[in-house]
Amino acid sequence: LFRSQFSADCYEGGYVMIDIPDAGRFLVVPEGAAEVDDLPEDVVVLRQPLDHIYLVSTSVMDLFVHLDALDSIALSGTKAEGWYVEEARQAMQEGRIAYAGKYSAPDYERILAAGCTLAIENTMVLHDPEVKEQLEKFGVPVLVERSSYESGPLARMEWLKLYGILLNKTEMAEEVFRQKVEQVAPILEQENTGKTAAFFSITTNNLITVRRTSDYVAQMVGMAGGVYIFDDLEGETSAQSTIKLPLETFYA
């Protein structure tokens, strides 16, 4: 296992208990299976099929594409023009996925009208806890994914398995993940080239945004045989993936 931010325990009858630290526990119940009595109050029941999902966390979309599960997503928290995933942009342009507002301002009326079975958010929603509370009040379970808290690229990719569980595509998820790990293996075995690389963007007020040293992008540079040039940058918190630098510091 590469991941550390979720665990999954399988039980007889196809039931699966998912535990996401600081985000909750979820019992996935197979379609047609009996309800489970006397569950702890903190456990959220997710009954399959989960086929009308409101997807807010953009990093999850590519994993759904790899699981051939775009048809499970009914609503998006990103507009069509905002998607970097071509399949998602096309699905929205064709009307197969509708825009239902960003994480801080969801269109509750549209979400309810679509019969939403699950909202997948990232930790940004924790800055607007009333949104999560309102969705749950309307009967829409909310799963806050924490893949951004994982320690490396393969750990983030392993969240594919969690969505495989939710979508009843466990075998496909396991196989896709295995293939991806095999593809990366030869790269990990090569010697470091010693070549340095930077990964950055420039803000409108002329600050340089760079990835901190332990961020997954910086790790990918190392995995590919390079040396991330900012080898001593850390954020104020473990969840902070970027740091802003003045131009003078960046070029120093």
Question: Where are the model-predicted features located?
Answer:
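Short, exposed beta-strand/loop patches in secreted or surface proteins that constitute
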Residues: 6-11
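A short, structured surface patch at a secondary-structure boundary
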Residues: 14-20, 24-112, 118-125
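Ligand-binding pocket segment of bilobal, Venus flytrap-like solute-binding proteins
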Residues: 16-19, 231, 239-252
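Stable alpha-helical elements in mature extracytoplasmic
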Residues: 49, 56-63, 69, 107, ...
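Extracytoplasmic substrate-binding proteins
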Residues: 52, 96, 109, 113-207, ...
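Alpha-helical, coiled-coil/dimerization segments enriched in small aliphatic residues
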Residues: 209-240
